[in-house]
Amino acid sequence: MKTILKLLLLVAVVTTTTSTAFAASKSTNRDWVDASTLTVINKAIDDGKPLNRLDISQFNIPKHARLYLTQSTGIAILFRTNSRSIGAVWTTTVKGQGVNYTPLFRNGLDLYIREKGEWVFAGVGKPSTKNTEHRSALVKNMEEGMKECMLYLPMHNVVTSLNITVDKGAIVEPMPSPFKHKVMFVGSSITHGFSAARPGASYVARFGRELNVETPNIGLSGKCKLDDFFADIVCAAKADAFVFDAFSNSTDEHIKERLRNFVKRITTAHPNTPMIFLQTIKRDNANFDSVARKRNDAQRTVAEKMMTEICSQYKNVYFINPGIYAGDDHEGTIDGVHLNDLGVQRTLDNIVPKIKKILKKYKIK
C-alpha cells in the first residue's frame, strides 16, 4: 500500500511540474493543444480518466494489476487540423526499457491520418530513452488542407500529460468519432500488444482500423487468469462485443476452476452480447522445453474441451480455434510467445474473417 501511495504521489508531482515547465518553454512558432480536450477513443468505460485505461478506484483491483490498468494502452486521440506539421510533448512515469518490446511500443506515439476513407500511417513520436519527458515531431511538410488524425498513445507506461503541437495559427479541433461500434478485448500480454513494433501495430489496434470499430484494450501482461476483477470490468463496461484471450496466462487448473463462473457472470451482465473466446497460442518456446510444452498442451486441451461444452449451453458465446496464431514456421514471435509484426498479421488473417461473420449476426458492421 505504501508503494502504491508513493507511486501515485510521484505521478501527481510529475504531472504538476512538467506541465508548468512545458507551458513556460513553448516555442513562439508552435501552438499547443492538450490532447485530453480532443476526442478520446478506445476507453472501456467513460470514467473521467482520459489518458488511463481505467479509473482503478471504481474496482477492487489487486495490487499487481493496478499500475497496468492506469497505463494508456490502446487509447487513441482523434482530431482534425490544417497544420502542415504535427508534433507532441508528453510525460510518462517510468524510465527504462524491457527486453521484448521496442522503446516506441513502450513510450512512443503513433500517428495515422485518414485518406480516402482509410487510416494511413503518418509518423511516430520518438520517445526519450533516458527521461520521462518526451518531445518529438510526428510528421512534417504535409500538403495544405484539413487532415483527420488518430494518435495512439504509449502501450506500456502511464501518460500524465500529452500536448499536440501544430503550426502557429493552425486549426486543431476534436474530430467526431467515425466508429459506430465498440469491440472490447480482454487478455494477456499478447492482447496488451507485446511485441508489436509500435502502438498502432498491435493486433487489437489493427483490428479496430480494419473493422472500423473502437477497440478498448484490457490486456494485462501475465495477469489474465479468469480472475474476478476481470469479470468485474467486463460486467461494468459497455461494448457491442467482447473478445477474450483468456487462456494464455491461465493454467489448466485455472481454466477448470474459474471458466464456468467467469462465463456465467459476463453473460448475465450482457445477455445479448457476443462473447468471443480465442484459443491460446501454440508456443514456440515449447518446441524443445518439455515442461513448457506440457503446460501449453494442457492449457489448450482443457480450453478446447470446456469451451465446446460452454458454447453448446450459451447461444452468444463463441470459441475460435485456432485463435491467436503465429504460424507454423516458428517465425511469428519475438521470444517464442509474444507476437512480432508477422505474428500479428497471421493472427489477424486468422481471426478477422471469423469474427466478422459472428458480428454480422448482431448487425455489427
Regions found by a protein language model. Give the residues of each.
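Glycine- and acidic-residue-enriched helix-capping/strand-helix junction motifs
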Residues: G98-N100, G193-A201, K294-D297
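Oxyanion-hole/transition-state-stabilizing segment in secreted/luminal serine hydrolases
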Residues: F207, C224-R260, R265, T280-A286
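N-terminal secretory targeting modules
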Residues: T3-L10, T20-K182, I358-K365
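Catalytic nucleophile-elbow at a beta strand-turn-alpha helix junction centered on a G-D-S/GDSL motif
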Residues: K180-V204
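Short helix-loop-beta junction
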Residues: V204-N217, T308
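A short helix->loop->beta-strand "cap" motif at the edges of active sites that frequently abuts
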Residues: H270-M275
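Substrate-gating cap/lid alpha-helix
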Residues: R283-N321
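Histidine-centered active-site loop/cap adjacent to the catalytic His
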Residues: I334-K365
